[in-house]
Amino acid sequence: MVINDLLWRRPRHHMDVDEAHDHVHWVELFFDLVHVVTIFILGNYLSHHLGWQGFWVFTGMFLAIFYAWADSSVYNSLYISTDMPHRVAMALKIVTMMTIAAAIPDVGGEGWMYFALAYALNRALTAYLYWRARCTDNAANTLAQEQARNFFVLAGVF
């Protein structure tokens, strides 16, 4: 049956699964690795901009990158999702983080625009993932609806 195929199954809350396990998929590990590289590049930015302005730019970008990673990790901990739309969204989130990493060295010039656009798209993709998870059959669907709304608003702000 198509609905039982792992590539097309909608997200499920981990509490709704009889035999939930803490298996980490390769895409999540690669997503983490891309964030590590991005933080490394951000550290290089700080080493070349040792003044207060460089520190505050570093701090702001670090917090944005950290929250992009943490929000995705929370989603992947709450929901079991192995279907094709989730994989495409994660691939796009990886591309947005690579764009952010490429924008960091010139963030004081034209790079800020690429950073902001990639970050906004990253937030919109996180909102999309929560929007898809709103169909769960328990109280967690309220959380998914609220998070989807919050991340869409945050994407619009950026």
Q: Could you describe each region identified by the protein language model?
A:
Residues 1-158:
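Multi-pass alpha-helical transmembrane bundle typical of ion/small-solute transporters
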